A protein has these predicted regions:
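Beta-strand-rich binding/interaction modules
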Residues: 180-182, 265-303, 312
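Accessory beta-strand-rich segments of carbohydrate-active enzymes
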Residues: 8, 12-43, 51-55, 60, ...
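Extracellular recognition modules
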Residues: 213-215, 333-337
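Short, solvent-exposed loop/linker segments at the N-terminal edge
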Residues: 257-266
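Conserved, mostly hydrophobic/aromatic
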Residues: 68, 184, 240, 332, ...
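Low-complexity, Pro/Ser/Thr- and charge-rich linker/hinge segments at domain boundaries
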Residues: 237-253, 355-370
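Active-site mouth of glycoside hydrolases
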Residues: 176, 194-198, 202-203, 223-224, ...
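Short glycine/proline/serine/threonine-rich loop/turn segments at secondary-structure transition edges
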Residues: 162-165, 205-209, 318-331
Length: 460
């Protein structure tokens, strides 16, 4: 079965790269930061029907959190090269819990660094293409004497509810560079410690007896950009989840609620990108409800094929809009229903949205036409025992602490937080300044002292 939106983006990639091997030189190359990684998309949940939304566990998701096999190596040269093969004997491996930091499991060393790069004083590194590099970038991480490697293996069977569907895997956070294999086949490579990395496993996954192998490297060229003022860890420190995709699936969605200048009326547009079998005609229905579950909007369109996907946008106007702010964080319940050609429900997507308008007038910030007074804090994801590997209860405790102390805003210093945090802030009425994973002051502190091409983008 061929799918709009999958044939070109996924199947075509696999046909071209099915014999590709993992290359350790990617660690040294700033132009290679992902291989076979799927496109980023919205953070929505999806279900086969409304009844699944009420279940404790979504039948389309399977967590791989828990105990994994593990081996620690000081550098690339000492790593177990063939550990990803199905015939590999991992009896000599240790056990490690995922998610978690490798350092807090008893390996390597815990380090806190502010403005320096972690290799300074030990090895000479300059960013690729800088005039001072003179070839130093060749092998600077793949051949470094100190660049620890964590080799993980997970054995698993696919849940019955997942069988027969397209299967993706999502790593919500891996610090700092990762290689991925399934059943002996190379799947992909990714950098960026604080955003999800998603890969398609469909061509190689089995119902039973799967061997998933992940190799995590503490440093790569991404380290030039991830020079935050914090503890330096590595490993799989956020959730790992298998995702089963229905035949008709919402790949990406953008809800855009707009509050008009009268602060009474509003408009919401919902843009969708859907994958479906090429022969399918798909209808999308947008439903908006208030807190009391009264239906305010219900509109449908037939999606059209655009750029290899099924796409469409639904717009709706509202009157007597209830506003969102920190005093009354009112959220509406939005739903997208995708229906197959015979009218049957193929997938349902719930999402809460709010109406608010932010403006800057004469250097003053206004929210919904009123001056906004911000009482905010910087917040790291942090637990005194588990580091940046935190859970829902840690987030709830932070929200509770902020509300008790009349704090109405938070800055996610210095990286994207786990996705549930943003939902919690919506619910609690917390304004969010969301930072990207970019801090390179290890280069700008030398500004004027060395040749300026050494300064990494983002530092000046």
């Amino acid at each position: 079965m061929e799918y709009s939106g999958m044939k070109e983006i996924v199947w075509g990639v696999w046909k071209e790269r099915e014999n590709m091997n993992a290359d350790m030189k990617w660690l040294d190359n700033p132009e290679v930061f992902k291989v076979n990684q799927l496109e980023s998309h919205s953070d929505h949940c999806y279900y086969l029907d409304y009844s699944d939304m009420k279940k404790e566990k979504n039948p389309l998701l399977q967590s791989l959190n828990g105990q994994w096999e593990f081996a620690y190596s000081k550098n690339v040269m000492e790593r177990p090269v063939d550990f990803y093969k199905e015939t590999f004997d991992a009896s000599g491996f240790d056990k490690i819990m995922v998610p978690g930091h490798i350092e807090l499991a008893g390996y390597d060393k815990i380090r806190y660094i502010n403005t320096m790069y972690p290799w300074e004083g030990k090895e000479y590194h300059r960013g690729a293409y800088s005039m001072e590099a003179t070839g130093a970038e060749e092998g600077m991480f793949s051949e470094a004497q100190y660049n620890p490697v964590g080799s993980y293996i997970k054995y698993f069977d696919l849940d019955r509810s997942m069988c027969g569907k397209r299967i993706h895997i999502c790593f919500e956070g891996v610090e700092e560079a990762m290689y991925l294999w399934l059943n002996g086949q190379f799947i992909g490579y990714a950098e960026d410690s604080f955003t999800p990395s998603e890969f398609d496993l469909t061509p190689y996954i089995k119902e039973k007896g799967n061997v998933l192998a992940v190799q995590v490297h503490k440093m790569s060229t991404a380290a030039f950009l991830e020079d935050q003022d914090f503890f330096r860890f590595f490993g799989i420190f956020r959730n790992v989840t298998l995702k089963a995709l229905p035949d008709v699936h919402l790949e990406d969605v953008w809800f855009k609620p707009v509050l008009n200048q009268d602060n009474v009326s509003g408009r919401v547009s919902t843009s969708m990108k859907v994958s479906a079998p090429d022969s399918q005609h798909v209808t999308a229905c947008f439903i908006l409800k208030d807190r009391e579950e009264n239906v305010l909007v219900e509109k449908s369109i037939q999606l059209t094929k655009e750029n290899g996907h099924m796409e469409g946008t639904i717009c709706a106007d509202l009157e007597n809009v209830k506003l969102w702010d920190n005093h009354n964080p009112y959220l509406y319940h939005a739903y997208v229903e995708l229906k197959a050609e015979d009218g049957s429900l193929a997938e349902v997507i719930p999402y809460d949205i709010g109406f608010r308008r932010i403006e800057i007038i004469d250097k003053v910030v206004y929210l919904n036409g009123k001056r906004l007074i911000i009482t905010g804090v910087n917040r790291h994801e942090w637990n005194a025992r588990t580091g940046r590997c935190i859970g829902i209860e840690d987030m709830k405790a932070d929200i509770s602490c902020m509300l008790r102390n009349n704090i109405n805003s938070v800055r996610t210093c210095h990286y994207p937080d786990q996705i549930p945090w943003y939902y919690m802030c919506d619910d609690a009425g917390i304004y969010v300044m969301a930072e990207t994973n970019l801090e390179s002051h290890g280069s700008f502190q030398k500004l004027g002292a060395i040749e300026p091409s050494c300064n990494v983008p983002g530092s000046i």
